[in-house]
Amino acid sequence: MSTNVVSIKDIKREKHAIDASGKILGRLATEVATILMGKKKPTFVPYLDIGDYVVITNASKIKLSGKKMKDKIYTRHSGYPGGLTVETFDKVIVKKPEFIIEHAVRGMLPQSKLGRQMIKKLTVFAGPAKGEVKEEK
C-alpha cells in the first residue's frame, strides 16, 4: 500500500457561492474556512492549499446571537500614543460589512503564509453579487 501525494497540477478548485443573509457570523465563518482550507476533500494535506473559491453575498445582512450586536468590539491601533480605535459591531456593519466576515474567517485560517494564500480565494460582497455567481445554500 502506498500513500498518494497530491501535486499542484492535480488540484481541482470549485467556486462556492454562499448567501449570508440571516446566517450567524461564527457558523458561517467556520463553514467558509473549512471550504477555503479544503478540509472536506479526500486529498487534504495540511501543507498544501487545495481549498476552493468562496463568494459570499449579502454580508450586510449577517446576524450575531445574543447581545453581541452592541457588545462585540473591533479594535485597531494607529501606532501612535493614544491611537487605539474601538468600534462596536453596529458601527462596523454599516461602514464596511465585508470586513466583518473577512476578519472572522481570517482568524480561523492558519496564521502563516499558507493562511494568507487561502484568504485570497475569498470574495465578499455587501449586497447581491456583481456578475454571475452560481448559488449554493
Role assignments for model-derived ranges:
Residues 1-103, 113, 126, 131-137:
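Ribosome large-subunit tunnel/peptidyl-transferase-proximal elements
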Residues 106:
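Acidic, metal-associated active-site segment
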Residues 119:
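Positively charged, solvent-exposed patches that mediate nucleic-acid binding
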